[in-house]
Amino acid sequence: MPGIVTTNALNSGIYVRGGNSNENGFLINNMPIAYPDHLTGILSTFDPYILNNSTLFKSGFPARYNSFLSSYINMRPEPGNKHEHEGELTLGLVSSALKARGPIIKNHTSFAASARTSYLQHISRLYNRSMDDKTNPNYMPEYSFSDITATIDSRLSDKWRMTAFGLFSLDHMKMKISEHVQYIFDWHTFSGNVNVSYTPNANEQWDFQFGGKNTYSEGDAFGSVPMGGGNRNYALLGQATYSRRLSDKLNLNSGAKFEYSRFETANKSDDSQNLLIKSSDKDFNLYELYLDINYQLNQNFSLNVGGNYQFYAGETREHSFSPRAKISYTVNKFTLWADYAKTVQYLSLYPYFTVKTPIDIWYPLAKGTQPATCHQYSIGINQEVGQLLSFYAGIFYKDMRNVKDFASDIQTEYSALSNRQIQGKGHAKGLEFDLTLNHHALYMRANYTLSESKRKFAEINNGKAFNPPYDVKHNVMINFSYQISPRLLLNTLWTFSSGVYTTFPKGMVIAQNITEFNDDRPILIPVYTDRYNYKLPNNHRLDASLDYKFGGKNLLFKLSVGAYNVYNQSNPSFVYFQAESADNLTKIIPKSKVMLPFIPYVSLRINW
């Protein structure tokens, strides 16, 4: 979609309208979950076999959504098949999956479940072994993931319904810079929730939800500046909502929420057992009330107004009220709309490196700080031309206050971060265009986003405004599909995005351990001054696939052949620095890691 970009394969997060990737809320049945952070972009982060229905809000947020500045993605699980069992098996070079759904109690209770795993680490190892240049190798990161997703849907009676959802994910990555320098990352998540709905009549509904989420990550660096540690975040959540249709023109939605969150960080100890020692623990309670009113003024105009109140109780206590408003005008197949929304956020993300990684540390408000706030204004139009063509254009502006970052004197350990959390301000603005053509066997979609994002902190870059590492000026996506025959489908996807800013050191300091003589290799320590002082090259790539369907009465097959990064574009995912010596001179050369070069794949999907 326009206004949404990704930066590199090492970062699975999305950046919405100039915001950071930690400013997006992911929800299942309106209940927040932990983001799994699967990398590469080859495989979807969430399994569409279970989560095949989602709604994205990047402006005009309903009042029930708060605590994230940029966007909300609400996904609704597949209820399963209450009449008969069905399954799916996928076997491929990159990944495999086993999926099933069917009745637990026929016509009453059903389930859907999925288990996926990847083999990318084996492809990486083969690639690394095949390299000819052993003196200056460019190793491909070894990455793997597995996840399990499950849901249960039960119709308890004509008025009562219960659903349950669970998602567990496990990821591992080893990134080898040289024979002596490597990074090892591990992270996993768990999310689960239960929803009970009561519908006394056709005009009103009650929902009661309970859930929890947990994330854990651990990182180690070997052969460079010693660094490593782990962090954990878990939360307990509950909410009750009430919806009522007061008339054909007026609808009301209201609710109350509660969240308890705890954050634990630990440093890697120096002993041989490689233990994690506790560094800091933080927690908070969040209480929330909201009200939404939807009113159809007449045949053409509709109005949505609402408000969200939150009370945050942690190291600091904060009250916030977030108003929302949206007005739409529709005539025939043309829609013009304008909206305003205030959002607040209490969490920030401390980066482990100069680029975002899945092991970055979530951290709540420090004492004496205020929640980040965003005031967003946007207008847009939608125009449909029959069943053939649709066009969208939009413009937005975001004014952000009390956005968070961290002082630059933390580099090597997961120490207490509260004293180094800093506040600043920023803005984002942009234009969005989207064009979709759907004509018989041909489908094409193209969108373009022009945007600018700025941040300003007194403690960073001498108080000068700067482009953050998620400022992507130009972003283009072109998707083309052609149904060659009833059995054969061609898919292509080309993406382009402007290079993002990263932090390059101004120099290096050589350090050496003079107390131990078993290793005389010096350690190079980078010296940083300004942040985000270098712009990486533009990113672009082409993905293509050809799907062939065949089968009989009981078994259906789909054979997929394709390639990721067809023309082998070297899009940098990670930048590092390496010393190269010649003629008694040593130069510090910037290097980059490509997460995924050209990778062909073949997979066979079997449905029954």
Regions flagged by a language model, labelled:
Residues 1-61, 78:
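Periplasmic N-terminal accessory/gating domains of Gram-negative outer-membrane beta-barrel systems
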Residues 157, 165-167, 247-253, 257, ...:
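Structural signature of Gram-negative outer-membrane beta-barrels, strongest in the C-terminal barrel
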Residues 235-239, 280-290, 366, 370, ...:
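Outer membrane beta-barrel strand-and-loop segments of large Gram-negative receptors
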Residues 487, 495-522, 537-543, 547-608:
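C-terminal beta-signal and adjacent terminal beta-strands/loops
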Residues 299-300, 397-399, 421-506:
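Gram-negative outer-membrane beta-barrel transporters
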Residues 216, 267, 315, 329, ...:
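Surface-exposed extracellular loop regions of Gram-negative outer-membrane beta-barrel proteins
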Residues 94-117, 133-172, 184-206, 244-250, ...:
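Transmembrane beta-barrel wall of Gram-negative outer-membrane proteins
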Residues 45-84, 88, 97-99:
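A beta-strand signature from Gram-negative outer-membrane beta-barrel systems
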